[in-house]
Amino acid sequence: MEDERSFSDICGGRLALQRRYYSPSCREFCLSCPRLSLRSLTAVTCTVWLAAYGLFTLCENSMILSAAIFITLLGLLGYLHFVKIDQETLLIIDSLGIQMTSSYASGKESTTFIEMGKVKDIVINEAIYMQKVIYYLCILLKDPVEPHGISQVVPVFQSAKPRLDCLIEVYRSCQEILAHQKATSTSP
């Protein structure tokens, strides 16, 4: 079963949450951000090139124009490959673990897997960000030395920064799977 809902990020931008239910013990959540706007790309490129042309008219050095074009292209490629994330995915399977995938605008993907045996809980935490209180979903990892301790806090959906209403949807589904996993692991 699959459904899609629209939410907002902390800045008011649009986000699309796709929920895929494969089984009672396996669910996937995909948060998609809007693609790179052609208008903003054109505005930045024109600004850099006009500034370079202004410097060219003052200095009469053609290397300034060539450098501006080269730097703009390198900057755009770097932004698309290392910064702009189009989609973040959280896949949770109660018998295996949690997989988080970030898909960049260039097509590059970054995946992290956490074994379910290392997961203590999934919670919604709050933080102060840019003079605002924001909420974020995070995975608490068990401390291998102390059974009741937490060794690490792993934030989820770091790039999309969804608002609380979206996080609650994901949180409830994750808690259902964690409860199912605990029930099956304690039953004889």
UniProtKB/Swiss-Prot annotation:
GO biological process: one example: GPI anchor biosynthetic process
Keyword Cytoplasm in record: yes
Assigned protein family: Belongs to the PIGH family.
Origin species: Homo sapiens
A family per Pfam: PIG-H
Cellular component, GO, one term: endoplasmic reticulum
Protein name, as recorded: Phosphatidylinositol N-acetylglucosaminyltransferase subunit H
Keyword field contains Secreted: no
